[in-house]
Amino acid sequence: MDGKKCSVWMFLPLVFTVFTSAGLWIVYFIAVEDDKIFPLNSAERKPGVKHAPYISIAGDEPPASCVFSQVMNMAAFLALVVAVLRFIQLKPKVLNPWLNISGLVALCLASFGMTLLGNFQLTNDEEIHNVGTSLTFGFGTLTCWIQAALTLKVNIKNEGRKVGIPRVILSASITLCVVLYFILMAQGIHMYAARVQWGLVMCFLSYFGTFAVEFRHYRYEIVCSEYQENFLSFSESLSEASEYQTDQV
């Protein structure tokens, strides 16, 4: 891959993945240090530690909760930006837009879920927190499958299979983790459920990092134009737009 020909937008999903991963692990280590949770590699519980190392429990009390809220808010914002850019990227390349629109809506709902679970801690409002968790995991999983299908279908720069197959594998891994997580939770096997949850989140973040492969081919621009007093007619506007169609913003 020639770095000189790569768009700077490829770094957006990478920043999302690295920043969110680092932030969540900081929350984890703060909670372990404060004896709020016991470590993921513990064979048994430490004396005085009451909780399994779920992400929500790790970020439930200050100071970890402050970091957790900030990380989830920033992650939700970056995920929303990725969702919009991905939608714009694929819009001129898909004949039936419903799948692309579904991917945008699903990721927007997952982003909204991130803000709920990040700002409504488990002990403060468990119901809203769980709604946020369901939105994030549920629509996040749906997003992964939709984007995997779009990757194989659109085949940008003939890299559809190279990127699509790893996304299918990650989507299957995420789906398996979600199923295992709820099964283990229902059976009260909290240590293994917490480990699966961390694996699930890392798979999600790895998936988002793969968007860098396709974003490196695209340049996005924000165009600012001065307000004109003399309006063009609607037909003239359409005519100009049809003459200058690109897949850039």
Curated annotation (Swiss-Prot):
Q: Per the UniProt record, which residue ranges are transmembrane?
A: 10-30, 65-85, 98-118, 131-151, 169-189, 193-213
Topology Cytoplasmic: residue spans: 1-9, 86-97, 152-168, 214-249
**Chief subcellular location:** membrane
GO MF terms, alphabetically ordered: mechanosensitive monoatomic cation channel activity
Its membrane topology is listed as: Multi-pass membrane protein
Give residue spans on the Extracellular membrane side: 31-64, 119-130, 190-192
**Keyword set, alphabetical order:** Cell membrane, Lysosome, Membrane, Transmembrane, Transmembrane helix
PANTHER family listed in its UniProt record: FASTING-INDUCIBLE INTEGRAL MEMBRANE PROTEIN TM6P1-RELATED, TRANSMEMBRANE PROTEIN 150C
Q: What protein family is recorded? A: Belongs to the DRAM/TMEM150 family.
| Protein name, per record | Transmembrane protein 150C
Provide the taxonomic classification: Eukaryota, Metazoa, Chordata, Craniata, Vertebrata
Instruction: Identify the gene encoding this protein.
Output: TMEM150C
